[in-house]
UniProtKB/Swiss-Prot annotation:
Its main location: secreted. SMART domains: C4. Disulfide bonds join C1548-C1637, C1581-C1634, C1593-C1599, C1656-C1752, C1690-C1749, C1702-C1709. One of its GO terms (molecular function) is extracellular matrix structural constituent. This is Collagen alpha-2(IV) chain. Residues 51-529, 550-1529 are annotated as: Disordered. Residues 72-81, 225-235, 326-335, 410-419, 428-453, 564-582, 699-714, 731-783, 865-895, 946-977, 1040-1051, 1077-1086, 1108-1146, 1210-1231, 1280-1296, 1367-1386, 1462-1480, 1499-1510 have a biased composition (Low complexity). Belongs to the type IV collagen family.
Length: 1763
């Protein structure tokens, strides 16, 4: 209960006392007697007496009814602890408990008593031999022995004396004697016969190259047809294996859970809960970084006009300004006052005879002439008059300025070849390349525009919605009204400034002086025919009247079209001699000067009036630089093909040539080679120039930053309530800024997995993204064409006659003067900054810069996310003593503790019940001597007896009375664990203990929830230097890093190369000078230009062929020729490296359609193209075979349902069509059965990234519609969409339209090709964290199923919750050129640049001061029609109420035929027409050069069968052929495993098929037990490697992986043994590779047990030889062995450590010392049944005792023995 209901006890006590007090005061009645002893009288009633004393308490009343329940009283205090309850009844026997933990080892027991003697032992071993005894007596002599062996031959005896005997027989041949000395050389023998031809000797060394032979005769021939394709080669080896999967993370895998149940139905919505309490305000965030500079705001309203300032001091006179641009022509004024009489004009031509005049004064006499008539109306401007006669020659004018370069002359004669020049500069970048093929389809497009407005809903007001998130800033408002004119700026810089824009039209000047009479006007247009005069048959003609006044000058006519160039005029008469010049002496010719900077192009010179004759041919000029491509010439005759020369060395750069003529637009060329990066230029000086003329409309830029909201406008007038209706729902606001980071929510419960939805429709177009990074500056646009001139304005009012004007404008420029001297002037002042140049071609990457200085500390970052829990830290120092904590809740039952210290003696307990008699105890040790007892009574002394033997222990006596408590006993053995007692009272908090020893680190817990982002810590101390790590191997190429921070600004580079010539400057004003003196007659002039080429002469006779000339210089690139015919298709080249993506070229104009090329070889099936425009209908073709499936067309409008047709006759079966294109993506089918495991595919190569697509061509202009009626009719039906029209002039921004209705959902589009990576999108809203799913088992990748039928378009889905933020994508390729953005803000003024290096010679100097005013020039030609004026203000907005949609009106009358439209764009090429008639036979061409030898031709068609021949005579029998190859056999499924013992995959023996390859597994060890693999069986070749290729599972449906100390052992390679265990990618070089092959017969291993290689049995062939590997052991004496008949027992390579141990959980491998390999040894024949002699072999001699072996396969041609 709340504390408000508790009433304190001390408040109740006084109220009780008060009640008690009131009840005790009762009435007291006093009796007043009124009797008299005398008389009795009745007195009046007295007043009430005072109350009497309180009466005694009354008797106890009846028990009242129970009252209502009172308020609950206060909580009582805790009662004192009650006495312990009585002992409960003994409970039932419990079930057998879980076996307890083993107890601690007990203390050592006392030593036992000595045991009895043991049984007699076994007989001992024989003793050692005794010492030799004393020698005995000699025995008797023995028996005689056997005869001994014959003795050695004795010495030679003395010769006997006797007679000579008869000759003996011939003895045996003696031993061959020693070789004799060599004899002298003999004479030469006769020459022998010619011997047989000897064997071919070895090739000698390569001889020197021979001299070049004479050129051969030209061969005649043509390229032969392509040869047949060769036979299919043998199957290549299997490709490399796929990537090795990484070992999975440690963890415990829980068995599969059941399938989720069906999703329940959606429940009713619950009631709205109460509003929660307001949260506490969050912590104030750190101040944000300064934002970007905002857009310039809208102009504010004009302020009140300020006070007029005081007039300033007069400024100094400014510099003379440059000539401004020509102003716009003014409106023609009213005619001025009549001028003075002009010079008399030439007599006009005699006019036509007029009609007879009216009769004179009388009937027969002429009347007097009438007064002159009024001047006629202003005539229309007449046509231009004929050229006047040439005037007399004027005086020679002053020498003009040197003219600009003339038009390029005709090419001179070809000069002698110059010396080989140096390498030229890089050429001008070529025109953009040919438009590439359409790229891959891009990613899905952006969210589309909102659809049309839906049907108005019913206006039932809904509940008020929640406040939306604040929207983003709106787009910048419309342009405001023009502000007041700004303060006048400072005067411009006349020396260094650029010419400004044309100034505004000045006020009307004062009236000028009367001018001289003007030249006679142009003749007027003949007037209309006059009324017929009165007829007078007899009247004479009237006299000729006086000449009338000149009429008003006509209005200027519109500007005519530019005429064709006129014919050159006749030669004028020579002028008068000029004034004599100062006599000069011709100086010697100076040395040729360096090439000057290219001059600005001058004005076109006047046509010369001299008749030119071709001069003598000049010396050959130097070759100029390559000009721009000239106009496309006519197609020339084909020339003779020249001999292909060797490419020459690059020549030196020639001087700059004249600018070439602009070429015709052709197809854009390929991208040029990127140039070298230019050097950084110096910053220039100068003020910024005035804005240039407006260029053509650029493409829309990237969207600018959102502008600030405009100022709030004034409040509008209130709308009457009658017109208030709920408006249509507005568009969704822009998404608000992301709110502050919320508190971390609790993780939600995992939801059930819903069924897979149908594929959604394409989403709506997304909101515009944040502005991207600024793109590269585009190329400057081409200046726009001049707009159409407006109509002339109305004539102005007549001005008052003005005062004398200032001197007039200088006259027109004079004729082109003689060339001036060419001395180089002094360098001019620094030029103005040029326009921004085009972006250079990206340079080669620079060298890495020097290491920069350490940067300043950065701005503190935002608070980071909570990290994962760290590793256990080192134990900390003991903390200070803590405050005692509150008593905790009782803990769970703990395990039994060790025995405690002996307790203090307890109080004596009550006497217990008598126990059952115990078993007899073990006799105790002798006790210590007791205390002396009380002296007994003295007995009689007895005789001392002998000590008796120890008696048997007696039966236990009756239990005596309970004695006094003895001393505490020794500690007993630990008892069994008692049952859990009641929870005791919480103890008093103890003292804080000393800090314990730090415990062992616990196992890793689950990762915690993400914590609150912590503050940034301080930088740690630098660590100690680590041990050197193992030698690194080259890692794989990493992902591209994020772009680095921009580096510091580098030092200033040297000045750049001179720029390209600038644009043509404005025309300068002509200078004025004093007339020079007459010069002497000059030297003869330069030879004139060559004349025009004459008409072509008749064809001459063929001359004799000349000698081949020297190789000429490479000519200028010719204009692109007409497209040639398609050549034969080349052989496919090798796949090139991916090039860098080129810059997208400009879209070129469409080229002329090329000729139809020869049909190419049928290419591979291409990707599906976009559907083309329908062409015109061609002629009906012959019926073709069934074509390939076409692309799906756009869905048509549904047609009306037709009547059901009758069944047709069954058709013939058609030919089998080509497989169709893959259909649209179908609905997901039911889950299929698990497929068989497929073979792992070879990894594919990376595809080339697609090029960005080009901007598409403009479409065809739409057809003009019929003119509509101007009355606002009812709304008609929507027409069919027209073809897109040409771009119109940009209109004024229209009024904001009403939102459209939502459109129908479109059909699902065709699945696009994967697009290029887009620009990273804006950061999405943080999504709700999903519950981490359980890790599924890896399935075997199935084969891709067939695409299903396309699904129906699904309903439009609800917007999903924002997903979690994805990782930052790689930077995408540059996107397509964006639309031009809103104009950016002007940047801040940059720092002043460093002074630059001295510049190259500047342009010609500034214009000098003005000369004296010249004589007024002649009237100029009428100006061109002025530009149209600015758009007037918009008219008043008509108030138009939206009418109802009317019925469709009747068909209108056909309109008037419109004017002929502009010619349309070239159409798409139509279908090929029928072949034309064969043309006439052309002339014979020149014989061509011999072609390259053609490839082997295809075999010809078989010839016609010849005439049957006469049968020939029978031939001789041929020799018997070799035995044929064995017939086809079927593989019997024998498997052979080959281990390479290297990191290379072995090849199968010839004739065998490789089934798979992998890694050589020897055995595995789990739970301290090993399992061996026979290396000859396929199970020893695992296709994937892992240090832990298995996991183990127990009976609890739990499997554990990489959680124990299990191991795997693999055959290893010859890689050197590492010092430390290797891990991850470092393991691969140590694991042997293997291949499993299918053999045609059985395979065995034979062992020789010697160092000789054994032979295979008869009928068996050898596969490989090796060493006999028998057994192996590893950790814990576990291991295995090989069957000696298996090929796995014969390893090709011997090494003492043929395998490596890998620890599964750690993921490392190493050669440990307890690994042993066992090999068969060599056994000699005589050592078979002997005791082996121990022997130790050192490195280098190990193979001397290892048995050799051979693996054999049964020959397929051996017939099995059939008994």
């Amino acid at each position: 209960m709340s504390s408000r209901l508790r009433i304190p006890l001390w408040l109740l006590l006084p109220t009780t006392a008060l009640v008690y007090f009131v009840t005790t005061v009762s009435t007291q009645i006093t009796c007043r007697d009124c009797t008299n002893r005398g008389c009795f009288c009745v007195g009046e009633k007295g007043s009430m007496g005072i109350p009497g004393p309180q009466g005694p308490p009354g008797a106890q009343g009846i028990r009242g009814f129970p009252g209502p329940e009172g308020l609950p009283g206060p909580k009582g205090q805790k009662g004192s602890q009650g006495p312990p309850g009585p002992q409960g009844i003994k409970g039932d026997r419990g079930i057998i408990g879980v076996p307890g933990f083993p107890g601690n080892d007990g203390a050592n027991g006392r030593p036992g008593e000595p045991g009895p003697p043991g049984a007699p032992g076994w007989d001992g071993c024989n003793g050692t031999d005794g010492a030799p005894g004393v020698p005995g007596l000699p025995g008797p002599p023995g028996m005689p022995g056997f005869p001994g062996p014959p003795g050695v031959p004795g010495m030679k005896g003395e010769p006997a004396i006797g007679y000579a005997g008869a000759p003996g027989e011939k003895g045996d041949a003696g031993m061959p004697g020693m070789p004799g000395l060599p004899g002298p050389p003999g004479r030469d023998g006769f020459p022998g016969e010619k011997g047989d031809r000897g064997d071919v000797g070895q090739a000698g060394p390569r001889g020197p190259p021979g001299e070049a032979g004479p050129p051969g005769n030209p061969g005649i021939g043509s390229i032969g047809p392509k040869g047949d394709p060769g036979e299919q080669g043998p199957r290549g080896p299997q490709g490399p294996p796929g990537p090795v999967p990484s070992t999975g993370a440690k963890g415990t895998i829980i068995g599969p859970e059941g399938a989720p149940g069906m999703k329940g139905e959606k429940g009713d919505p619950g009631e709205a809960g109460p509003r929660g309490f307001p949260g506490t305000p969050g912590v104030a965030g750190q101040p944000g970084l300064p934002g970007m500079k905002g857009e310039k705001g809208l102009s504010g309203p004009a302020g009140p006009r300020g006070k007029e300032g005081r007039p300033g001091l007069p400024g100094p006179p400014g510099f003379k300004g440059d000539r401004g641009l020509d102003g716009l022509p003014g409106v023609p004024g009213l005619p001025g006052q009549k001028g003075e009489a002009g010079f008399p004009g030439r007599d006009g031509a005699k006019g036509a005879r007029g009609p007879p005049g009216p009769p004179g004064g009388g009937e027969f006499s002429d009347g007097p002439p009438g007064p002159p008539g009024l001047p006629g109306r202003e005539g229309q401007p007449g046509p231009p008059g004929a050229d006047g006669y040439p005037g007399p020659p004027g005086p020679q004018g002053p020498q003009g300025l040197p003219g600009g370069p003339g038009l390029p002359g005709l090419p001179g004669l070809e000069g002698l070849p110059g010396p080989k020049g140096e390498k030229g500069d890089s050429g001008i970048p070529g025109a953009p390349g040919v438009q590439g093929p359409p790229g891959l389809a891009g990613p899905p497009g952006a969210k589309g525009e909102p659809g049309p407005r839906g049907v108005d809903g019913q206006s039932i007001p809904g509940l008020p919605g929640k406040d939306g998130r604040p929207g983003l800033d709106g787009l910048p408002g419309r342009k405001g009204e023009m502000g007041l004119p700004g303060v006048r700026g400072p005067p411009g810089d006349s020396l260094n400034g650029l010419p400004g824009p044309p100034g505004p039209r000045g006020p009307q000047g004062p009236k000028g002086y009367d001018g001289r009479d003007g030249a006679p006007g142009l003749p007027g247009i003949p007037g209309p025919k006059g009324d017929r005069g009165g007829t007078c048959a007899f009247c004479a003609h009237g006299a000729k009247g006086e000449k009338g006044d000149a009429g008003y000058a006509g209005l200027p006519g519109p500007q005519g079209e530019r005429g064709l160039p006129g014919i050159p005029g006749a030669t004028g008469a020579p002028g008068d001699d000029g004034l004599p010049g100062a006599p000069g002496r011709p100086g010697p010719p100076g040395p040729p000067g360096q090439d000057g900077l290219p001059g600005l192009p001058g004005q076109k010179g006047e046509p010369t009036q001299l008749t030119l004759r071709p001069g003598p041919p000049g010396y050959p000029g130097q070759k100029g630089e390559t000009g721009f491509p000239g106009p496309r010439g006519q197609e020339g005759l084909p020339g003779k093909p020249g001999i292909v020369g060797a490419p020459g060395l690059p020549g030196p750069p020639g001087p700059k040539g004249e600018p070439g003529l602009t070429g015709l637009p052709e197809k854009p060329g390929k991208d040029g080679i990127p140039g070298l990066p230019g050097l950084k230029g110096e910053p220039g000086y100068g003020q910024p120039g005035m804005p240039g003329l407006p260029g053509m409309k650029g493409d829309a830029g990237l969207p600018g930053l959102p502008g600030l909201p405009g100022a709030v406008g004034p409040m509008g007038p209130p709308v009457p309530e009658s017109q208030l209706r709920p408006g249509p729902p507005g568009k969704d606001g822009l998404p608000g800024l992301p709110g502050p980071k919320g508190e971390a929510g609790f993780p939600g419960a995992p939801g059930l997995q819903g069924p897979a939805g149908l594929p959604g429709l394409p989403g709506m177009k997304g909101n515009p993204g944040l502005p991207g990074a600024p793109g590269l500056a585009g190329l400057p646009g081409i200046p726009g064409e001049k707009g159409i001139a407006g109509k002339p304005g109305l004539p102005g009012l007549t001005g008052a006659k003005g005062e004398a004007g200032y001197p007039g404008q200088p006259g027109l420029p004079g004729p082109k003067g003689e060339p001036g001297p060419s001395t180089t002037g002094p360098p001019g002042p620094p030029g103005f900054p040029g326009l921004k140049g085009k972006d250079g071609i990206p340079g080669a990457p620079g060298l890495p810069g020097l290491e920069g200085q350490r940067g300043l500390p950065g701005v503190p970052g935002q608070k980071g996310e909570i990290g994962l829990p760290g590793l256990a830290g080192a134990p900390g120092f003991p903390g200070a003593k803590g405050e005692p904590g509150l008593p905790g809740l009782p803990g769970k039952e703990g395990p039994q503790g060790p025995p405690g210290q002996p307790g203090a003696p307890g109080f004596p307990g009550q006497k217990g019940d008598e126990g059952l008699p115990g078993l007899p105890g073990v006799s105790g040790m002798k006790g210590d001597t007791g205390l002396p007892g009380v002296p007994g009574l003295a007995g009689p002394p007895g005789q001392p007896g002998f000590p008796g033997q120890k008696g048997q222990p007696g039966f236990p006596g009756v239990a005596g009375a309970k004695g006094e408590a003895g001393l505490p006993g020794l500690p007993g053995a630990p008892g069994q664990k008692g049952e859990q007692g009641l929870a005791g009272l919480p103890g008093i908090p103890g003292m804080k203990g000393a800090p314990g020893i730090p415990g062992a680190p616990g196992q890793d817990g689950l990762p915690g929830l993400p914590g609150v982002k912590g503050d940034r810590g301080f930088n740690g101390l630098p660590g100690e230097k680590g041990e050197p790590g193992p030698a690194a191997r080259d890692g794989e190429k990493g992902e591209p890093g994020l772009p680095g921070q921009p580096g510091l600004r580098g030092p200033q580079g040297p000045p750049g190369l001179p720029g390209l010539p600038g644009l043509k400057g404005d025309e300068g004003q002509p200078g004025y000078g004093a007339p020079g003196l007459m010069g002497e007659k000059g030297l003869p002039g330069l030879p004139g230009k060559p004349g025009r080429p004459g008409a072509p002469g008749p064809k001459g006779l063929d001359g004799a062929p000349g000698f081949p000339g020297l190789k000429g210089e490479a000519g200028l690139p010719g204009a692109p020729g007409l497209p040639g015919q398609d050549g034969l298709p080349g052989l496919p080249g090798q796949k090139g490296e991916s090039g860098f993506p080129g810059q997208p070229g400009l879209v070129g104009p469409p080229g002329l359609p090329g000729k139809m090329g020869a049909p190419g070889i049928r290419g591979e099936k291409g990707d599906a193209g976009l559907p083309g425009l329908p062409g015109e209908r061609g002629l009906d073709g012959l019926p073709g075979q069934k074509g390939e499936a076409g692309f799906p067309g756009a869905p048509g409008l549904p047609g009306p349902v037709g009547p059901k047709g009758s069944a047709g006759a069954p058709g013939f079966p058609g030919l089998k069509g080509e497989p169709g294109l893959p259909g649209l993506e179908g609905q997901p089918g039911p889950r299929g059965m698990k497929g068989e495991a497929g073979l792992p595919g070879a990894p594919g190569r990376d595809g080339l990234p697609g090029l960005p697509g080009m901007k598409g061509e403009a479409g065809l202009p739409g057809l003009p519609g019929q003119p509509g009626k101007s009355i606002t009719g009812p709304k008609g039906n929507a027409g069919l969409p027209g073809l897109p029209g040409k771009d119109g002039l940009p209109g004024l921004p229209g009024l904001k339209g009403e939102p459209g209705k939502p459109g129908y959902a479109g059909a699902a589009g065709i699945k696009g090709e994967p697009g290029l990576p887009g620009i990273p999108g804006a950061k999405g809203e943080p999504g709700l964290s999903g519950i981490p799913g359980k890790r599924g088992n890896d399935g075997i990748p199935g084969k891709p199923g067939p695409a299903g039928l396309p699904g129906l378009p699904g309903m439009k889905g609800e917007s999903g919750l924002p997903g979690p933020q994805g990782p930052a994508g790689l930077p995408g390729l540059p996107g397509l050129k964006g639309e031009p953005g809103l104009p950016g803000f002007p940047g801040q003024k940059g720092e002043t640049g460093f002074p630059g290096q001295p510049g190259i010679p500047g342009l010609p100097g500034m214009k000098g001061d003005s000369g004296y005013p010249g004589a007024p020039g002649r009237d100029g030609a009428p100006g061109k029609q002025g530009e149209p004026g600015p758009m007037g203000p918009p008219g008043a907005q008509p108030i138009v109420q939206r009418g109802e949609k009317g019925e469709m009106g009747p068909m209108g009358a056909p309109g008037i035929r419109g004017e002929k439209g502009l010619p349309g764009l070239d159409g798409l090429p139509g279908p090929s027409g029928p072949p034309g008639f064969a043309g006439a036979k052309g002339r014979d061409g020149f014989p061509g050069q011999p072609g390259m030898p053609g490839e082997k031709g295809a075999p010809g068609l078989p010839g016609f069968p010849g005439i049957e021949g006469i049968p020939g005579p029978p031939g001789l029998p041929g020799p018997s052929g070799p035995p044929g190859p064995p017939g086809p056999s079927y593989k019997d499924g024998f498997l052979l495993v080959k281990h390479s013992q290297t990191s290379e995959v072995p090849q199968c023996p010839p004739g065998m098929v490789k089934l798979w390859d992998g890694y050589s597994l020897l055995y595995i060890e789990g739970n301290e037990k090993s399992h061996n693999q026979d290396l000859g069986h396929a199970g020893s070749c695992l296709s994937r490697f892992s240090t832990m290729p298995f996991l183990f599972c127990d009976v609890n449906n739990v499997c554990n992986y990489a959680s124990r100390n299990d191991k795997s052992y693999w055959l290893s390679t010859t890689a050197p043994i590492p010092m430390m265990p290797v891990s991850e990618g470092g393991i691969e070089p140590y694991i042997s590779r293997c291949a499993v092959c299918e053999a045609p017969a059985n395979v065995i291993a034979v062992h020789s047990q010697t160092i000789q290689i054994p032979n295979c049995p008869n009928g068996w062939n050898s596969l490989w030889i090796g060493y006999s590997f028998a057994m192996h052991t590893g950790a814990g004496a576990e291991g295995g062995g090989q069957s000696l008949s298996s090929p796995g027992s014969c390893l090709e390579d011997f090494r003492a450590t043929p395998f490596i141990e890998c620890n599964g959980a750690r993921g490392t491998c190493h050669y440990f010392a307890n690994k042993f390999s066992f090999w068969l040894t060599t056994i000699e024949d005589d050592q078979q049944f002997r005791i082996p002699e121990s022997e130790t072999l050192k490195a280098g001699s190990l193979r001397t005792r290892v048995s050799r072996c051979q693996v054999c396969i049964r020959s397929p041609d051996v017939q099995p023995y059939r008994g």
